Amino acid sequence: MSSPARLAVILGPTASGKSALAIALAAKLNGEVVVCDSTQVYRRFNIGTAKVPPAGQKGIPHWMMDLVEPHEIFTAGDYRRRAEEILRDIHARGRLPIVTAGTGLYLRALLEGLADAPTRSEELRARLRERSAGRGPEYLHRLLRRLDPGSAARIAPRDTQKIIRAIEMRVLTKKSVNEIHAAGRAPLEGFTPIKIGLKPPRPALYARIEQRVEEMLAAGWQEEIRAILSTGVSRDAKPFTFIGYREILAQAPVGEGLKTLPLSGPSLPAATINEIRKSTRHFAKRQQTWFARESNVHWLPTFGDDPLAIERSVAFLR
């Protein structure tokens, strides 16, 4: 029987340099990058999801991006099935798969598997949406906090789709999402994950977040949103709930078309830009909380583009 293949896993909060480290390692170790991010599976939503553009990939193949249209549903189980095929193909070609993990649930699905969850209940979902109407966008999150505090701590208050799914699972099974996922998993076979975690100092991370928001706006984030909407994509599409997209889109109220959507970063209200920064910082904290529970991680107290991080990661993987 052949020994398990190496699987590099780079995890850490947004703006910590996971992609930079993965690309550097791929160049040194004959690898390919497998993105593990629930926002990057959607086509056309590029700037605000921090997809590495083709020029930035430096010739390194990147997988598991641009998989579905904005209106399509894509689950952690879908990710597991498709990513596992990619991992095995990369290994079969004699190359090292390098996973860049920003979405903890997707990483759990890939490495540990997910238990059989209850099927969707459209009746329950309709009741939840009806109850939340007129009570504000965070009503369902407050409800989830009472039913399943652990899930509420991991899910953003405005991520309605994930909140409804967590409530649905709790109501239908009488168990928390963690309890459901802990039972009946099918771990990934044939690979030995080598986890490398990025944990830069918080002040430095927050400074990078602020810088990246500015860079995204300068790169044409608003123009991207305008272009997506002009193709007929609904404002209700899930990717428009992602950080930054929802704040920018709020500048073009329903019924007023796109004429009120600011054309460039400087024309956005300062309060909107600050809200994007704040939401991103909160997201980074949630990611850190999730990844802190991961076992057997080689933690590096720096960013992924730090030469020391690259040097130490190569040593871990050889």
Q: Residue ranges of each PLM-predicted region?
A:
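Phosphate/pyrophosphate-binding catalytic cores of soluble transferases and nucleic-acid-acting enzymes
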Residues: 1-318
